[in-house]
Amino acid sequence: MLNVSDDNRVRTLTLNRPAALNAFNEALYDSTAQALLTAADDPDVAVVVITGAGRAFSAGADLVEMQANITNPRENAGQHGFFRMLDVLSAFPKPLICAVNGVGVGIGATILGYADLAFMSSDARLKCPFTSLGVAPEAASSFLLPRQVGRQNAAWILMSSEWITAAEALEMGLVWKVCEPTELLAETKRHANVLASKPIPSLMAVKTTMTAPLRPQIDAAIERETACFAELIGAAANAAALSEFTSRGQSEE
């Protein structure tokens, strides 16, 4: 589900549901949130890297579980869940680096808004498929994306549900560096080790002063998005999209 490894004060969290393209189900939300909480409190961890196993970074929310949750909301409920994971990401006090090794969809793309540095494989792609699923944005992306990439780029990403290439993500400022696939993790960890060599209290002070002013705005954006999401989830467009996804998945098995 989630692999955790340490090297030179750098903790790497590897999303490990490769058969599901590392889609987030309740168990993975829980594992990721708990791993971040543990890393935040560990005096031997200076930097956290998040990456994915296999050919995907993360395919986003597990749509099969999402459809099941519409009819039975408590069936797959976890300890932390999606929103608690967002709280933990927003409050994470140490440098957080994402290494996008493959496709990143939904939260697999919007999680980059919480990264202090993002590296991306040259053959990876990103997508925010909210309009194709008939739902609203998530993870404060309606606030964080315009800050990262500008209003018009953010509008295109969030409204079009189109793929964004690594080159486009770099040009927009959504990621910091694009690497060859075979060099992604090495390059990510090389930079992570530079940060990890610095005093942890100083790293945390830099991050706090940069991110503390954003926390209330992130919380407000999530509240707005959640209200819109609640209106749209299970509505005609969303139900049709989820049904099509489930039918397609079953026909491919």
Model-derived features: positions:
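Acidic-histidine catalytic/liganding microenvironments
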Residues: 7, 42, 92-93, 235
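Crotonase-fold acyl-CoA enzyme core
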Residues: 87-201
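Hydrophobic helix-cap positions at the C-terminus of alpha-helices
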Residues: 35, 39, 89-92, 195, ...
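Hydrophobic/aromatic residues within transmembrane alpha-helices
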Residues: 13, 50, 62, 111-113, ...
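Conserved CoA-thioester-binding segment of acyl-CoA-metabolizing enzymes
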Residues: 1-53, 87
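Glycine- (often His-adjacent) and acidic-residue-rich active-site loop
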Residues: 52-88, 104, 132, 217, ...
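C-terminal alpha-helix plus adjacent terminal tail
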Residues: 1-11, 161-167, 182, 186, ...
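A general structural signal for well-ordered alpha-helical segments in protein cores
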Residues: 29, 63, 82, 142, ...
